[in-house]
Every structure is written in structure tokens, then in C-alpha cells.
Amino acid sequence: MSAKTNAKKKEQDKPQSSGLGLDGLGDLAGLLNEQPAANAGGAGPQELPLDLIDEDPHQPRTADNPGFSPESIAEIGETIKARGVKSPISVRENPDAPGRYLINHGARRYRGSKWAHKTTIPAFIDNDYNEADQVIENLQRNELTAREIADFIGRELAKGKKKGEIAKEIGKSPAFVTQHVTLLDLPEPIAEAFNSGRGKDVTVINELVTAYKKNPDEVAAWLADDSQELTRGSVKLLREFLEDKRSHDDGDRDPNTVDALTGKTDAEAGDGEQGPQDDDAKGKKEPKEADPDKLKKAIIQVKHDDRPARLILNRRPPAEGWAWLKYEDDGQEFEADLGTVQLVALLEG
């Protein structure tokens, strides 16, 4: 047999390729069996073992959050037991414990899964996550208490951030931040009512603080009545009562009130001891004609967060470009960036 014939026979004896490149299928199958490293840039969730996941010790929600109550966890646990976790949680790699993960958001689903005796949970891995992201997530779900929001803002202020920066970071108004900052340093009677859960409305607490600054004893006595409901309506009535009382104390007394020192009524004291000759000597002053081009009392009406308000002109603002405002509907007083305020009208009071 010639050399050419032998070469042709050897070529025929070789395994034939399909032409589709499937002869490397074994290697491809091996690649498919390999797990991606932490799915760092993966598009979908993966099942992670629950025993490799830890809750973030710095998460904004605290242990006494209503969503963490045993009853609440049992409720979500029952649904997970029956239907599983339909919305994956978000985690990030734990920098202090390689191979483990910290929860970005989804702590209730995590606890509910443990309650239901699950061993894994669907999760997205997102390493680009910070505390502000956690706050935003929970704010959008209305899952943070006012105290938790205030504590977060306090931590951000301690880092040197300004209220306006924090407001922009979490997608809220500067007034929202200012209201919650008030919760960090409450007068004792108001702090007791707030911490006990009697007053949860941030607006109500801010209104009480404003009233307390002018009438601490009266507000403390009002709060001492445990049966007193803390609502916007009740606090508005309290402030109106205190304002009326203060106006009477400032001189609008009954003219027949007897002065304890002189023994005379206000009307008698007002007559004085001067005779008619004194009046003639002093002469009568003609009332000065009012200037029609000047306002006796200016009222500047504005709009803030789509709510009617007015500028408080006799209170010093905290900084340039800021001012004190008062909402027309509930009387709440607060600081606001003038960049968020729309001028509506200038009236005479």
C-alpha cells in the first residue's frame, strides 16, 4: 500500500466532527456547572442559605419597631410558609466576614423565613448600598417610626452634614428634616409622652414644643392628664387657649379688677390724680393721620409643600435664606428654606 493510500485511510479513521462545534460539549457542560462568584453583577436573584446572612447592626429600624413585633413576624412567616418569599431581599457582602452577607433591606422577610423554618431565601447581591439607601427604602414603605428617622438624621448631622443635604439625600423637604431634628432634644414632659407612644404624630410633637417654650408649666400640666388625647385638633385648641390667656395677662384685664397693692380698680387707677388744669397744660394731641401708602401690619402669604402658610416676621431665622413659617390649616410653626417657598400675596393685617 502506497504512502498516499495510508494517509487517506488514517484521515477516514478520525472521528468526524458535526461542523457545529459540539465536539467541545464536555468542556461547556463543565462551565455550566461552575457557580458565579457572588453574582456580583448578576441580573437576577439567587437562593442564599439563611445561615450565611446577618442583619445589619446599623439598620435604621430598631428592636421596638412595630414591624418587628412577634405578632407581625408570625403573620409574614405564615405567608412565607404557605407561598414562599415572592420578593427577594437585598444583601451585600460582609467586609468583616468573607463568605457571609449583610441585609440591605428585607429584615422582616428574613425573620419570617426563619420563623417558617426555611433554609434559603431569594436574594439580590448589591454591594453599592449605604444607610441612606436603607432609610429611603423604609420611608417609601412607611416602615420607620419617627424616632428611627430622627436618630438617622442625628447621626448624619454628627457627620457634619447640613439639614438641606440630608433632605435631598432621602428625598424629603427641609421642613421634614427640621421637624424630626426636634425629636432629638425634647423637653422632659413631651419626651415622656412621645416615648410612651401617646404622641406619635411629629407635627403634634412640634406644636407642643412651640407651646412649651412660652408656657412650660401649663403644657406640662396638660400632658400630666393621661386621659388627654394628643391630636392635632386638641393641641390646636390648647395653643389657642394659651394665646388668649397670654393676651389677657399682657393687659387686657377687666377694668373692675382690684389691684392687690393699691386697692383700686384698674378703671380708678386709670383716672389718675391729675385735675383738669393738667389736661389744659399738656394740651390735647391731634391724632396723626395714617399714611395710606403704608401697611399697618404686613402679612406675607406663601405656599410650602402645596399648603398655604404665612411668614413669621418676628422670629429670627436660623440662617440666611431661611425663615420661620406657620401653616394656615393647623397652625404648625417650622423653619424652611426660602428656596422651597412660593410667594402668594402681601396683605394688611
Curated annotation (Swiss-Prot):
It comes from the Bacteria. GO terms for biological process: chromosome segregation; negative regulation of DNA-templated transcription. GO terms for molecular function: DNA binding. InterPro entries: Chromosome_partition/occlusion, KorB_C, KorB_C_sf, KorB_DNA-db, KorB_domain, ParB/RepB/Spo0J, ParB/Sulfiredoxin_dom, ParB/Sulfiredoxin_sf. It holds the Pfam family KorB_C. Residues 246-256, 279-296 have a biased composition (Basic and acidic residues). Disulfide bonds: none annotated. Keywords: DNA-binding, Plasmid, Repressor, Transcription, Transcription regulation. GO terms for cellular component: chromosome. Residues 1-72, 246-296 are annotated as: Disordered. SUPFAM superfamilies: C-terminal domain of transcriptional repressors (SSF50037), KorB DNA-binding domain-like (SSF109709), ParB/Sulfiredoxin (SSF110849). Residues 25-40 have a biased composition (Low complexity). PANTHER family: CHROMOSOME-PARTITIONING PROTEIN PARB-RELATED. In conjunction with KorA, inhibits the transcription of the kilA, trfA and korAB operons. Is also involved in the negative control of the kilB operon. Belongs to the ParB family. This is Transcriptional repressor protein KorB. The lineage of its organism: Bacteria, Pseudomonadati, Pseudomonadota, Gammaproteobacteria, Enterobacterales. The gene is korB.
